[in-house]
Amino acid sequence: MDLKLSVLIPAHNEEGSIRETVHGVFDILVREKILHEILVVNDHSTDRTEEILNKVSEEVLSLRQIKNSLPNGFGYAVRCGLNNFNGDCVALFMADASDSPDDLVKFYRTLIKGNYDAVFGSRFMPGGRTIEYPKVKLRLNRITNSLIRLLFGLQYDDVTNAFKMYRAETIGGLKPFLANHFNLTVELPLKVIVRGYSYTWLPNQWSNRKTGATKLKLKEMGSRYIFIIFYCLMEKHLTRGDYLKKKVL
């Protein structure tokens, strides 16, 4: 059975890329005849993002835009979207056009065919690709992911990658969310893993933004990533399975 896909796009001051991002997603999903909605969460933008979205909504009938009802911030915007999407599964997609719309199709079909609860992206496995990844950010990424792999005993090598797809029931089983910032992209997959949901990972492509400024502040995120990583580690070892996925009898 086909599932309705929600593509969740948090957007803060993305006037330079939001049109390209929405149209890119829409064109691919229509071509592949995938039932979908494109849910853009306007994260308190002060530029022309809202104006552009209003115009794009006349061209892209599957576009639904909402305003972030929570405080400003990437994690808050994603949480707002996760509380409001209406699909059977949801994929997090960056507004800066750094993700590839083609990967949505591959992940969607794998989720259905394998009956997985989640599908994760890896930019560093064979078939994955990064374009113009900043060297300092790349080095920190590899160190962080190596630490996570060691602590959790994982083969998966790109937990910090935001590009992932989840079934709606899986998202429900990951609540309540703790992270309010970019560390939410680590909280979600680690909870999938420690709570016993089924998952696989596929290669995906990432390219550095061409317009606008990155919203990720590395100096501010270190302690937040550490908090989430060790929270999930404690949940794994100390909660005696209280949060594990309920088995269907």
Where are each of the predicted segments found?
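Terminal low-complexity segments of carbohydrate-biosynthetic enzymes
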Residues: 4, 113, 227-249
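Catalytic beta-strand/loop signature of glycosyltransferases that borders the donor
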Residues: 157-158, 196-206
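Acidic donor-binding loop at a coil-to-helix junction in glycosyltransferase catalytic cores
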Residues: 182-188
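N-proximal low-complexity "stem/linker" segments adjacent to membrane-targeting elements
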Residues: 1-27
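Cell-envelope/extracellular polymer assembly enzymes that use nucleotide-activated donors
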Residues: 4-6, 37, 187
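Conserved donor nucleotide-binding strand/loop of the catalytic core
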Residues: 36-39, 50-84
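A conserved acidic beta->alpha catalytic loop
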Residues: 42-51, 97
